[in-house]
Amino acid sequence: MEDRRAERSCEQACASLQRQDYDMALQHCTDALLSLGQYSMADFTGPCPVEVERIKIESLLYRIASFLQLKNYGQADEDCRHVLGEGLAKGERAFRAVLCCMQLKGKLQLVSSILAKSLSGESLNGMVTKDLTRLKTLLTETETATSNVLSGCHVEDLDEGSCNGWHFRPPPRGITSSEEYTLCKRFLEQGICRYGAQCTSAHSQEELAEWQKRYASRLIKLKQQSENKQLSGSYMETLIEKWMSSLSPEKVLSECIEGVQVEHSPDLSVTVNTKKSHQTWTFALTCKPARMLYRVALLYDAHRPHFSIIAISAGDSTTQVSQEVPENCQEWIGGKMAQNGLDHYVYKVGIAFNTEIFGTFRQTIVFDFGLEPVLMQRVMIDAASTEDLEYLMHAKRQLVTTAKRWDSSSKTIVDFEPNETTDLEKSLLIRYQIPLSADQLFTQSVLDKSLTKTNYQARLHDLLYIEEIAQYKEVSRFNLKVQLQILASFMLTGVSGGAKYAQNGQLFGRFKLTETLSEDTLAGRLVMTRVNAVYLLPVPKEKLVQSQGTKEKVYEATIEEKTKDYVFLRISRECCEELSLRPDCDIQVELQFQLNRLPLCEMHYALDRIKDNAVLFPDISMTPTIPWSPNRQWDEQLDPRLNAKQKEAVLAITTPLSIQLPPVLIIGPYGTGKTFTLAQAAKHILQQQETRILICTHSNSAADLYIKDYLHPYVEAGNPQARPLRVYFRNRWVKTVHPVVHQYCLISSTQSTFQMPQKEDILKHRVVVVTLSTSQYLCQLDLEPGFFTHVLLDEAAQAMECETIMPLALATKNTRIVLAGDHMQLSPFVYSEFARERNLHVSLLDRLYEHYPAEFPCRILLCENYRSHEAIINYTSELFYEGKLMASGKQPAHKDFYPLTFFTARGEDVQEKNSTAFYNNAEVFEVVERVEELRRKWPVAWGKLDDGSIGVVTPYADQVFRIRAELRKKRLSDVNVERVLNVQGKQFRVLFLSTVRTRHTCKHKQTPIKKKEQLLEDSTEDLDYGFLSNYKLLNTAITRAQSLVAVVGDPVALCSIGRCRKFWERFIALCHENHSLHGITFEQIKAQLEALELKKTYVLNPLAPEFIPRALRLQHSGNSSRQQQSPPKVKSLYHPQSDHFQSDGIVQPNPSVLIGNPIRAYTPPPPLGPHPNLGKSPSPVQRIDPHTGTSILYVPAVYGGNVVMSVPLPVPWTGYQGRFAVDPRIITHQAAMAYNMNLLHTHGRGSPIPYGLGHHPPVSLGQPQSQHAEKDQQEQNRNGKTDTNNPGPEINKIRTPEKKPTEPKQVDLESNPQNRSPESRPGVVYSNTKFPRKDHLNPRHINNLPLPAPHAQYAIPSRHFHPLPQLPRPPFPASQPHTLLNQQQNNLPEQPNQMAPQPNQVAPQPNQMTPQPNQVAPQPNQVVQQQSQAPPQAPQPAPQLSPAFQAGPTNAFFNNAVAHRPQSPAAEAVGPEQPPPPGLPDGHSPLRAITQPGPILASPLNNFVDESSPGLPIEEALDGVHGSVALETLRQQQARLQQWSEHHAYLSQGGIPYSHHHHPHLPHLPHTPIGLHQPPVRAEWKVAGRADDETETTFSRFQDLLRELSHRDQGDTGELAEMPPPQSRLLQYRQVQPRSPPAVPSPPSSTDHSSQFANFNDSSRDIEVANSPAFPQRLPPQLFGSPFSLPSEHLAPPPLKYLAPEGAWNFANLQQNHLIGPGFPYGLPPLPPRPPQNPFIHIQNHQHAAGQEPFHPLSSRTVSASSLPSLEEYEPRGPGRPLYQRRISSSSAQPCVEEASAPQDSLAQGKESQGHSNPPAFNFPAPESWANTTSSAPYQNIPCNGSSRTSQPRELIAPPKTVKPPEDQLKPESGEVSSSFNYSMLQHLGQFPPLMPNKQIAESANCSSQQSPAGSKPAMSYASALRAPPKPRPPPEQAKKGSDPLSLLQELSLGSSPGSNGFYSYFK
């Protein structure tokens, strides 16, 4: 009873406190504590100690609150100390648990608010304040943490009971793979992180491990859910999964099907002009002959709330019977209508749409008649106000050109006279010239990790020069052609108004600024702030013929004034006379801006003036003491308005000078009274004797404030000693200065200019007020250091350290230095990415803030904000200021809108062709509408509505222009629309934030949260993502508002992308709690986030059309394929001009563009030719990410943004994927990375090649592909995508649109027979040219190389794709070898005659390609066969799905016989695989041989499923499922490739002939003879699961391998040839891109199918290799016998983190051998080259010695490059980059050797093994090496897809190296899909024909890898980095690399930034 009594008293105390009955509350608390006092801790009969502790702490907290309210501070303080002592003594975690519990019950807020009020309102003594503040901080942290947990509650959190079992913060949302979690470098190095609890990176290894566990547990739950749903599973989800994973999507969903005619009204694409709109569509389906409609469903999840099925009727053309349709119906199930023998039947279906928000909404309606393909129709509605684009479309007034700079060598320059530069300025300009040799810039000081006393001057000098180069490049981008109005005088209005008259023969010229040059663009900002002169060239009316040798004259003119719209020039007398200029006339001129170098020279000067920099590096080992006394604290002379913290600051500043203090930091956000505090301190200092004060600010306006508001009134009040001297810039126009300030300035007798001060002027004044830039005048007066006793710097956070130190040149160690500012506001802008990485932009305040410990007495945080509403303050306090801010002002709120409000707009962000910025029209219209509404409802309490009342802030210039234009149309020009950079220091009553970005343009760039950028605070990502990533930007914007912050944007994107996602999640949660979330519900947001994270592909509408802005639609309808994505710069050498990729379509942006600009994500070029689908939306499109080169599945408009999913990119680009999650092997050229590798390969960006074209370049046929594949796989793993077909969804995601080749819409394969058959384009399979750089080792065209005549089997590389007529292929004759091959590969009976399908087996139906989702994955091989060669069988309906979908191993997947063409294996494979027909002969049938991938081919899926695995934990298994899908795909591809096999004879050694790929239908016979289990060959190959890999694998690393592989791959090609249906644009895209060969295409040949599909795991692959002569002794013996008997070490599951969701190795038991992967561990000698090499191969050989593996730019192994000794030869050296920059660092690639040796037992070991291994063998890092979760080198091999596992290297095959096979790494997810492994699939994905038998592959791989472990390092020039595929250089041995995550991170961080200036490639 006692314990109940205590608890009851505690509850009553809480209730009393809420009623504000404090005495009663106190009484109850005391009762509770007395009751508890009766128990001793050892008393077991009492309540449990934990409960006692909880009640005790709770009671004490209520007591403290009550005492504070009763003003009993002493008692409150005593209890406070008691709580802190007790709590911390018992362990902080237990204490926090109690607080969390209170917070969850809503009890903590009460105590916390009382504490906050007491601290802010009362003058408490120091000690009391200290204890209470400490307690308040603890409570705030708890509130923050719990609110984050609640708002971020992930699925698993909810399932496990809030927060039970987890000890750390919840992980960030929007992560699609555990691999995307990263460690926070800043926190690990410095122990503090500005993002605090909101950081999206883990703050310890333990937290990282927990996040990965949580992710895994969510995946497990997801798998369990999906298994539970298996029977009742969602039809829509299943259908989409099936469509996504099918390589022939047109067989799953099609816009037209035979026998059904569709009519619809109105148009499928509708634009409405109002926000609230309603639309209905009616579809009439006429079926002849009559057929049953089983289902109608809406597929697309994101916009589901807006669409519903409203009516369905059926009958003949005259009578219709209505069917029952439930309300808000999303899926209607029919099948009950009687058709009564009618010859036709008509169905009418009504679909309704409703919206109340602006946006672009899409939906796909499917009509299922029980057969595949299922009929679909897409509708789109664009809710946007009528957009008049005239202001964008009119010819720009200024023609902006990029021209050569004018200098004395090209023009005669007439300088402006009189020149007003002083001698000092001239000397500075001469002294600080940029060094001619860049080597002088890149000294060791720049390379050092951080700024130190010793490298201080040298490092900052160099960084300033580098920044100057970047600014110069930025400014030099413009030449403007303008009409210059000549004026004799002009007048300015406003405060700074006045008239100016030209004298002495000079005149003024005025020209108008346009968007190009406004403060809103980067270059415009530079022109407005750093340019003070222009060169002016008159443009003659008619072109004058210039005589040879004469140079044109250009005239210098100075900039007199700049206003928002105009720039006024002063034109010299000489110019006026020579050009006969007269006032009031106009002249057409060309202008070139001249950068003002003086400010930078002054910073150099300041650096050199600092004699002793000890002041800048204060010693903090001894904590200084600031004397405190009651007299000082309550000094009557202190202003009573000072609050406690401000008093503390004044006491510190006025501490006697005899006590030395380090610089005092007064940190305070906007509105906390920093200026007020400094002014009060200054008055106080003046009362001390012998003091002199220098007050320095960053801006003139702030300096004037000190005089107008503080010093002037103080002087007037009778304090003449305080009379200040205000020093102004000498050229400042006097009229523009406030009259009050005039009396404190030195003005010339003519009253026209300010004078420079002399030493005596300074001596007469005790207070001098200057700006940072004018403080240099004082430095020139020979004032001795220490002249000023106090130096107060205000706005210190807005200036770079080099600027701040100028006044500090006058300080000594005894000078009291004070820096005031807000470290959380925007840092100064630095244009050079390189300098930004080295923190040039960081202010001295910021650096010292981090240098000082948390409780340092000289770091004072002012915490009372007087300017904003409490809700706004609380939000910023909690998120940015550690909970220390309190609202002290009383700002009125709006009655209808809570101060934090969110308006949803689900638009799509778009980027103009030549712009770096984005705009989002839905947000434009929403903002304008809300502004109008607010003006109508303006509260009286808010005062008059004027210019400063409403502000609209956005990060992008394009959005600023659009919002301004829209507001102008509504006559709302008094609303301020600005970029965030321009609003510092301003305040608005109401602030609207337009966030602009959506997942559609962000997510792909940001996969594993960019390794480097996530660590850099003001990185390019921040610039580019705006509010999504830059917390300072966000804080700066929000703190501008007084009463209302209204955000307009896409909530799902905000919560799932960028480093600020947790800030946004909290914001939206607060809006939800306060009912201010409009346009979407919090539940919908959470559901979409969960779907997104758990990879429900349907969130990404796979069928969504590509978004084309209306403005561009017309252009597109023409031949839009030629539209360039970026400003044309160079023709790509890689594209033959006739090729389908328009060479000019891809243009590299000028490198200077990259310097400070956000990287531009161009919208991908439209597909070739007129767009048939323009009106309808095209399907998801595969694009190449401009930044990463990854192929992205661009699904427009997902939930507002276009979602991007990675897709296997046919074109492997090595460095790209790595941009974010960097696989060391992948990124080889840091420089290239630095420069946006996207620029590297233009190839992918042109118009697309028809499907299949790029699939596997013959060159890449070989391993390289697999390497790529592997890499991709890893990447995929990294990215965590698992779709089979798009194995690399993430990866693709990563590829930005620019990178991808234009996407052709998918064309139905069937419809375009030419595309279909493998033979059809023998020569074309991969035009080399198509995927140039990445695919080619050499930039040169393959065409130019001497190539042998292509064999029929090879694809001729240089051929463009011409559709060839399809060769006749018999439908599936039993005899067709091709089919056989496929079947074999797939393990499915291909032809009826061959074997009867076993009952279990799914008979392939002709059209159905994908296996049922529910089935456990069919073996890939089977699938492929089924799809490709399966005889039609009667569909067996699955019970739960409509007939089209049958479940289980039924034939449903292939209900329709696949008609004449090899199916694309990959597509098919994707489906779940089915077990092999029991009938398959075990070992003998040829079929069998191939079919059974046997151990070798095991499909990832199958393996996963089959063996899910002894070795794998369930979550891995999950991953496997996805991976397997990918595997499957790979397999299928492989099969495809095989169809094209090259030397069939060679391959078929076993006696099984390989058919030529001419005969698509002749399957290449299995390479059975080689008895290997195919998979082993893949030691490195990726399993299908790694689709990405596959994609990347395009180039063979080893030619021989290639050769061998090519055979197989070719088979694949056949499949490739097929073209996907138009709707599957994405797929097609995929195909279009040159694909890397499948990562894991193990040759099907030797699969031994002894058992049905049991062996499908990889082991089979391994086995195959093992058996294969090629690797005879390499495999562990166990492999031979059993498919899965790997050594136990191999069974250890890889760390979760590296499970590749998609591309994981699925074979649980098998090790993945990456034969073709990063390195071949086996020591096999290279195969001798075969004469009939594929031309590509020749090329490669041409470049490499026979033993070397060809370099595949993308492949991971290529990256390792160990095999490329002669890299340098290939490295193109471009102009434009100094040699010192050219060497590419090899750090990115790491030797695999060690990895290879890593025992498979544990990944962890893998990590160690990195250190020890046989170095000689390879230099490529094993994938696993970076996969180890536990490994200290987590970043080494991070699978791009985020999958948890990386693939293990070739351990299997090469036991000695013990590298793990990729299979293990495959995510279990893959398991679902693949039960068996399809070569075809692999081939399809990887696209490399099997050129050699497995064994050979292995051998060659091995040798090559061993051969050149130490490839020479390539040197690369900046330009070449931009243009050429990155060449990997041999990776350094891993052992040498720091394996700890930090070091890896740092390395990675060096080269990957998109916008960099590129200097660091050299550094690395």
From Swiss-Prot:
Gene giving rise to this polypeptide: Helz
Motif DEAA box, residue range(s) on this chain: 794-797
Protein name stated in the entry: Probable helicase with zinc finger domain
Subunit structure: Interacts with POLR2A. Interacts with SMYD3; the interaction may bridge SMYD3 and RNA polymerase II. Interacts with SMYD2.
Keywords: ATP-binding, Helicase, Hydrolase, Metal-binding, Methylation, Nucleotide-binding, Nucleus, Phosphoprotein, Zinc, Zinc-finger
Low complexity composition-biased segments: 1388-1431, 1941-1956
SUPFAM superfamilies, per the entry: CCCH zinc finger, P-loop containing nucleoside triphosphate hydrolases
Enzyme class, spelled out: hydrolase
Biased composition (Pro residues): 1365-1374, 1635-1644
Compositional bias per record (Polar residues), positions renumbered to this chain: 1116-1127, 1755-1765, 1799-1813, 1826-1849, 1872-1881, 1897-1910
Phosphoserine modified-residue sites: S248, S1636, S1760, S1763, S1788
Residue list for modification Omega-N-methylarginine: R1245
Predominant location category: nucleus
PROSITE patterns named among the record's database cross-references: ZF_C3H1
Record Gene3D superfamilies: P-loop containing nucleotide triphosphate hydrolases (3.40.50.300), Zinc finger, CCCH-type (4.10.1000.10)
Top-level taxon: Eukaryota
GO terms of molecular function: ATP binding; helicase activity; hydrolase activity; zinc ion binding
Organism name: Mus musculus (Mouse)
Zn finger (C3H1-type) start-end: 178-206
